[in-house]
Amino acid sequence: LKAGTPISYRAGDQPNNALSLNVFNPGEIASTAGTSGVVYGVLDQLDYDKLSRVNTFAHVNHTEEQMRLGVLLCINGTGILNSWLKHNFATSLSSYGDMNELASLSPIGSKGLSIIPFGNGAERVLENKDTRCSIHGINFNIHSNGDVLRAAQEAIVFSYEYGMNIMRDMGMDINVIRAGNANMFLSSIFRQSLASVSNATIELYDTDGAVGAARAAGMGIGFYEDSKEAFSSLEKIAVIEPELEKREQYLEAYERWQDHLKEII
């Protein structure tokens, strides 16, 4: 850098991702679903999970005068499960799009099939237990590839909901979840299942962390008057609402999944 170049912004990857989605204030939620998955929300009161299943730390706009704390839920076994299935189970399919299409043939709940997706090491949300990945309820007479693929996506969604309940217990309202249009959020099954299980609206945006950091740096040097101006051009490209008429089916599948998890932990 040339001498005199202003350094006006710094942040970790998940606070920066939240910023890129214009998540600054209490009740606003950001999410990612790559190799691992994250749900990140903002609180305006000092709180923490006594079992340390989620992390609490200062958000990018926290000040002594205005408390803004980020609460981070991380699920290690997210997209890596989908990737493992692609390379070891669905080898005849050429893309994740093909996997999603096959999974869409299976009904909500995957005909009673449940997957515990924690095969990427110990999970903080489980108090650092390493449960490994497991499949429950498989029936050789009724289940097929599509059921397994759908159950995997539902398993990740259910893991998010399990963790978001911890965040709710800390006083966080989860009504809208913002995410970039990437990774597992490209799957309509994943998006719709997450919206319906959590009873939250999902908003997808055309952005990424690099763009968010550039906007933040602009705010830091005064190029933008405030965050409202900085994010005025942020493009919302899709909105996914919960399927209220089918929510009972999603919740029944979640409860079955949670019962299997309780048996393990």
Predicted segments, located by residue:
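Active-site core segments that coordinate phosphate-bearing ligands/cofactors
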Residues: 1-178, 183-265
